[in-house]
Structure formats: structure tokens, C-alpha cells
Amino acid sequence: MDPKLLDILVCPVTKTPLQLDKAQQELISTAANLAFPVRDGIPIMLEEEARTLTAEEKERFMKQKRG
């Protein structure tokens, strides 16, 4: 995914920044507790297409966010 695109995309639910999970090809919103799929390099930013993060996933991404 283009890093410039990631810089301007925000969560459609909370309007907060997203994190890219390269392994799962998802954009992560820890604020909304959602993972949005990236299909063929195209982010699918629809709430109904997103999946809910598990508690473990959310904690992992929160730690990554803090550095």
C-alpha cells in the first residue's frame, strides 16, 4: 500500500489515524476496534466490511502505536 495514501486515510467511524497490518492486509483502527480489509492494494473503508479486533490484537496494535 502506498505510504502517502496511508497518511491521509482515517477511520470512517472515528476519523482517527489507521495502522497497516501488512501480514493480514488490513488497516487497523484501535479507536473503533475494527480492521478494514485491503484487497488487491485497495482499502475497503466500509464499516460493514470491517471485522472486530480481538482483545489481543487491539493490545498488540496499541503497543506498536506507542512505539
From Swiss-Prot:
GO cellular component terms, semicolon-separated: cytosol
SUPFAM superfamilies registered for this protein in UniProt: Trm112p-like (SSF158997)
Pfam families listed in its UniProt record: Trm112p
Similarity comment text for this entry: Belongs to the UPF0434 family.
Protein name (record): UPF0434 protein Tcr_0959
Species of provenance: Hydrogenovibrio crunogenus (strain DSM 25203 / XCL-2) (Thiomicrospira crunogena)
